[in-house]
Every structure is written in structure tokens, then in C-alpha cells.
Amino acid sequence: MIACRDVSFSYPASGPVDGECLTEGALKHITCTIEDGSFVLLCGASGCGKTTLTRLLNGLIPHYHEGTFTGSVYLGGKDTRDLSLFEISQMVGSVFQNPRSQFFNVDTTSELAFGPENHGLPEKAVRERVRLVAEQLRLESLLDRSIFSLSGGEKQKIACGSAAAIDPDIYVLDEPSSNLDAYAIADFRKLLMRLKAQGKTIVISEHRLYYLRDLADRVLYMKDGEIRGDYTAAEFQSLPAERREQMGLRPLDLNDLKGIALPHGRTGDSEWKIRQFSFAYKHQPETLHIDEVEFPFCGATAIIGITERENPPCPAACAGWKSGAAALCRNRAGFIPEKSG
């Protein structure tokens, strides 16, 4: 069981820390209990204190991040102040928002094996953990790869696999879907379903809510460093969409998004293309048009084209995993040349 008793925390006033509030305190008088085997969603607008609360639950506060900490956090009845980070890591597996911040190796297989190795598992057991995690998360194609060659989404997948390889009783995840596309999120949801079925305790901080629908048993809504709402899954889902929007939350159902056509079927992660796409603000003529430009990247060929108009603002578009979105940004910044077009 996880228990927070009148917890308040403020970072040193030396600058912003991942958007969390510093001047008035990142957390204020947090009191809550999370039962074993429960699935809890932390939600709220950016800067509300979600990330700071996850750092309290996985021991990074007070053992790594400095600040003013009052109250107590208990894991299995033990105060986190009295536990070392190593002891906490045996109980809690963490996945951070930025996967690069938690890598210890330069290749993917070693990264997956890092946790079990440091917990003293025999070599055979370590290999079996890596095999099992790769199978569950569909990471087989990422094994024996350089960390530096991975896309953002691939790095997050390896980070999730590294946490799962430790096989902890508690999982604390801070926006794990932030670098994943819709298909990868669907795969990740399946992993969460398996962990939930195993009776694991899961605490997940997220802006994307739709993939956690019918998974989370409980929702804690945070604002200004406080827990402003404590809902059962049914209570949260029954809130009117307008109310959730007022709370600064994203839709629970992607079909609620206006003007977006969702893809039907799965034809492969690498088959997304952008063609004949135009963008314009209401007060300006067309500022962006995409036809087709081809350039190689990471051993593959990305086919994306772009034509800029005069005095454009900053339009944006999104596409699927390994669609070439990152390559497009690198191309427009001048880091990689076009192959044609």
C-alpha cells in the first residue's frame, strides 16, 4: 500500500523544474492512500504537480531532488525517508517522461537487462526477463540496437521495458505515452492490462486519457499542487465532456475531437504518408502546402514534401510512428538534405 500523509514539497527557487510550480510550492498538503493492486490515474493541467507527486512515490524526492519536504510517504508501511533508493527500486519500477534521462547503457538489450542484473538475478534469469519483456512489449525488432539510433517512441518503449524487467509490485509512470503514436499506445495499453491482471499497483500521470479508459480504477485530479478531485472510474467517466474541458483535461474518447478523421485498420507503422496537405490560418492565405519530398533517414526513405508560403506562422502536423515526422523536422532545420524534390 502507498500512503501520503499531509505531504507538501517546494523546489529550491533556482528556476523551473519540468514546469512544476516553484514559488508557491509544487505540492500542498497531499493526503491519499493507494491500495495494493489498484490502478490510479493522476491528471491535471501542466504544472499542477503530477510529476512531483510521482517523484515522491518512487523516492526521487527526497533522495535525489532537493527541496523543502514535509509530511510522510509510506511504501508498504515504511517511510521513504528510511529507505534507500536501491530498496525503493526493488518495490517501484519507474518510467519517466523523457526516456533519455533513465538510460544507463548504449545498446537496447543491455538496457533491458540493467535492472535485473543490478538486483542480483542469475544470468539465465536475466536473459529470460529480457526475452519476456521483448515479447510482451513487441520489442524484438529493437533488441541489439544502439540507443542513439532509436526514435523518440522507440526510446520510450525501451524505457517501459526496462521498468517491466525488474518485475516490481508498484509501477509509477510519468506520461509514458508522450513519445508514442496511436498504434504504440495501443500496444502499451495491452501491457498495462497484463500488469493490472497480475495484481500490480499502477500509478500513472498522464495528459492523454483515452487509452486509460476502463483501465484506471481511480482518478486523482490535481490543480495548483493539490488534489482537487478523487473519482472512481465510473464517476470520472460520467463527468460531462464540458466539465472535463473546464478542468483542462483532454477527451476520454478520441471521437470527441472535432475535425479529425481517425485511421481505420492497421497497415503497418511505416506506411503513413503526407500528401496534398495545406494549412492556413483564418486571417492569412495558405501558409503551408505539402506535396512530396523524398529523403533517406536511418536506413529508410521518408517521403514527405513541403512548400512554404511567404511570412508563414508556425503550422504543425502529426503522423504515425516511424512516419518520418522527426526526419521532416531535421530536414527543415537543414540537418539532413532532400534526396529528391
Model-identified regions with their sequence ranges:
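Conserved ABC transporter NBD signature motif
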Residues: 66-78, 327-341
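Conserved ABC ATPase "signature" region
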Residues: 124-142
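Conserved ABC ATPase signature
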Residues: 146-150, 154
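ABC ATPase C-loop
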Residues: 163-164
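Catalytic Walker B motif of ABC-type/P-loop ATPase nucleotide-binding domains
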Residues: 171-174
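Helix N-cap at the start of a conserved alpha-helix in ABC-type nucleotide-binding domains
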Residues: 182-184
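H-loop/switch region of ABC-family ATPase nucleotide-binding domains
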Residues: 206-207
